[in-house]
Regions:
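Short, solvent-exposed loop/turn segments at the edges of secondary structure
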Residues: 2-7, 46, 96-98, 136-138
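Gly/Pro-rich active-site capping loops and adjacent beta-alpha segments
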Residues: 22-27, 32
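Short, charged N-terminal helix-start/capping segments
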Residues: 11, 18-19, 27, 66-72
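PLP-dependent aminotransferase class I/II
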Residues: 37-52
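Non-catalytic terminal extensions of PLP-dependent enzymes
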Residues: 31-38, 55-249
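Active-site PLP attachment segment
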Residues: 1-23
Length: 249
């Protein structure tokens, strides 16, 4: 059972069997189980033929090859990030990682006031999906390049992180404002960047096109910075005001 599609089984000890979730149409679960927590009692069955087809097409040699490539890609990124000052956690005895890596970003927060969230959001301005945030360690980012990424794409990702590292240094040296900078305000949507009013202390071009190749094939973020975890912990009513019902009458 991983973090992807919910297709893997979840096992419990015998004394918990009677509390397993039930289902309205399929006989499953225990006598004291709660109502269904998923509409599909057998998980995401559609994933099974996909996995089976993947195994058949690759075969034993192919599976070994893609596994090697996934690990090679991950270690290529990890070694490159370490040269940029990123600390990689959970390395093996030989200093290598598996198919993914976790960067510790806490030192950047202490030195520059730039958090792992700011880095993840800024990556979106380069056209990259934000990495997994603060899992399984707080203040970290997790990246898994997979076996299918070409070296050119990995190099672009490294160049993006190098630029972000330089942007953090600009904040530390006072060349960029501590709160009004490209990292704290990322990601930048096309709506914000094309608005008539621009009050930030940096150029639109720096926000939108931090590198030349970004301008050649820009993937625009559709949503800007939101309140993130604050919205999860603080309920806010988005209903129309009560006065609106009186106005209708």
């Amino acid at each position: 059972h991983g973090g992807g599609p919910g297709v893997g089984p979840i096992c419990v000890a015998s004394h918990l069997v009677e509390f397993l979730p039930t289902h309205t149409m399929v006989k499953t679960g225990g006598e004291h189980g709660i109502h269904a927590v998923a509409a599909a009692p057998y998980g995401s069955v559609g994933m099974l033929p996909v996995t089976y087809g993947y195994l058949l097409m690759l075969g034993a040699e192919g599976l070994e090859m893609v596994t090697k490539m996934a690990i090679l890609n991950a270690n290529y990124l990890a070694s490159s990030f370490e040269k940029l000052g990123f600390k990689i956690l959970f390395k093996g005895s030989k200093g290598r990682v598996g198919h993914e890596m976790i960067w510790d970003c806490n030192m950047f927060n202490k030195e520059y006031g730039i958090s792992e969230l700011d880095i993840a959001k800024r990556l979106m301005d380069f056209g990259f999906h934000a990495p997994t945030l603060s899992f399984p360690v707080h203040g970290t980012l997790m990246v898994e390049p997979t076996e299918s990424e070409p070296k050119e794409e990995l190099d672009r990702f490294i160049e993006a992180l190098k630029t972000i590292r330089e942007e953090m240094i600009e904040v530390g040296e006072g060349k960029a404002d501590k709160t009004d900078n490209v990292l704290k305000n990322a990601p930048h949507t096309h709506k914000v960047l094309t608005a008539d009013e621009w009050s930030h202390a940096y150029l639109r071009s720096k926000a939108a096109y931090p590198l030349a190749w970004v301008a050649e094939n820009k993937f625009w973020p559709q949503v800007g910075r939101v309140d993130d975890g604050y919205g999860d912990r603080n309920l806010m009513c988005t209903c129309d005001p009560l006065e609106s019902s009186n106005d209708e009458k």
